Amino acid sequence: MANQRKFFVGGNWKMNGDKAAIDGIISFMKGPLNADTEVVVGCPQCYLMYTREHMPANIGVAAQNCYKTAKGAFTGEISPAMIKDCGCEWVILGHSERRNVFGEPDQLISEKVGHALEAGLKVIPCIGEKLEERESNRTEEVVFAQMKALVPNISDWSRVVIAYEPVWAIGTGKTATPEQAQDVHAKLRQWLRDNVSPQVAESTRIIYGGSVSAGNCKELAKTGDIDGFLVGGASLKPDFVTIINARA
């Protein structure tokens, strides 16, 4: 079934870039890119329209966050409806920086995911453990709790791509070994099988994030339960094309 799950590579630009930098990214995103890989880039919200208008049409564009309602007195927030109005179809939610820098709890993230799906967006919910949680053998406890919070608000699993990102590996240069990453992905898939359905477990893409690079992507892509990547800093550089083509 792994071969039936389309390989997925997302780029999370975080709070980086300006129009000139985006133009540079667009120039190398013309590829060639593996046609069997779905590609989405997550850009700062002020550049959603610019990126969508200039990025090749075969590449999706995602917001990096949104709120849980369509409109209202929520200064500084954007809604799924606004993201769609900019011509974009995707949103990244629950990234570890939203959880750990901005203090977003599991329940809020779940509500955001639910509203985004209701509004018609496709969603990349992020989960993952911190270093102290891994070192105290709590990885499964943490990621399963994060998944349990998400499930009640997921109305359409076909529009969900789960991103497992161990927090200790994000931007640190440390990467989970292919064996470590595959182990967590396999356990997450079994959790879906046990707590949602076998069909959802087999069809849902679970991607890996955490210092993915041109140097390690091919080994990570060979594993049975890693269905792609969510890439941070490397998505701003031409190496991103190598990562997209990891299974080429």
Swiss-Prot record:
SUPFAM superfamilies: Triosephosphate isomerase (TIM). One of its GO terms (cellular component) is cytosol. Expressed in skeletal muscle (at protein level). Changing residue 180 to A: Subtle increased IgE-binding activity compared to wild-type. Substrate binds at residues 12, 14. Its EC number is 5.3.1.1, 4.2.3.3. GO terms for molecular function: IgE binding; methylglyoxal synthase activity; protein homodimerization activity; triose-phosphate isomerase activity. Gene3D superfamilies: Aldolase class I. It is found in: Cytoplasm. This is Triosephosphate isomerase. The active site is at 95 (electrophile), 165 (proton acceptor).
